[in-house]
Amino acid sequence: MIAVIQRVRKASVEIADKEHASIAAGLLVLLGITHTDEELDVEWLSAKICSLRIFSDEAGKMNRSLSEINGELLVVSQFTLFASTKKGNRPSFIEAARPEQAIPLYEQFIAACEMQLNQKIKTGIFGADMQVALINDGPVTILIDSKNKQ
């Protein structure tokens, strides 16, 4: 799994020109799932994201987690994170998991985050054409790959 994590002041997802979900201050996570991902990836990545200390404390240091600032989480599936551009100019998405594998892992990831943060997680709709809007705070953008554990 690959996650692009963005610290935001606010973020929202529109589907068919209607707002589907929105958050105030917190994290926007773009989540890509590959065909080799499994439940261990879900557990490790959700725990890592939910405990990341990337929010400022009183001294201005990144020292607080999402729960410590009472922030919200918006998770959006994004298979294009596994694009390969090795050949030609059109990306290949062969490394992205097929929906029948990816959807259960996506749902497990959301459930794991809800359990760890003790809050309802806002989401996009898997496979939908979505418009994502955000105000990046910092900007702080972090890429985490569950296979590399970094």
UniProtKB/Swiss-Prot annotation:
Alphabetical UniProt keywords:
Cytoplasm, Hydrolase, RNA-binding, tRNA-binding
Molecular-function GO terms, alphabetical: D-tyrosyl-tRNA(Tyr) deacylase activity; Gly-tRNA(Ala) deacylase activity; Ser(Gly)-tRNA(Ala) hydrolase activity; tRNA binding
Matching entries from CDD domains are given as: Dtyr_deacylase (cd00563)
InterPro entries named in the record: Daa-tRNA_deacyls_DTD, DTD-like_sf
A Gene Ontology annotation in the biological process aspect, one of them, is:
D-amino acid catabolic process
Task: Pinpoint motif Gly-cisPro motif, important for rejection of L-amino acids by residue range.
Answer: 138-139
The UniProt entry's GO CC annotations, sorted and at most eight, read: cytoplasm
Subcellular location per the Swiss-Prot or TrEMBL entry: Cytoplasm
Q: What is its main location?
A: cytoplasm
Q: Which reaction does it catalyse?
A: glycyl-tRNA(Ala) + H2O = tRNA(Ala) + glycine + H(+); a D-aminoacyl-tRNA + H2O = a tRNA + a D-alpha-amino acid + H(+)
> What family classification does the UniProt entry report for this protein?
Belongs to the DTD family.
PANTHER family, A to Z: D-AMINOACYL-TRNA DEACYLASE 1 (PTHR10472:SF5), D-TYROSYL-TRNA TYR DEACYLASE (PTHR10472)
What is the official name of this protein in its record?
A: D-aminoacyl-tRNA deacylase
What organism does the record attribute this protein to?
Cytophaga hutchinsonii (strain ATCC 33406 / DSM 1761 / CIP 103989 / NBRC 15051 / NCIMB 9469 / D465)
Q: What is the lineage of its organism?
A: Bacteria, Pseudomonadati, Bacteroidota, Cytophagia, Cytophagales
- The protein's gene is named dtd
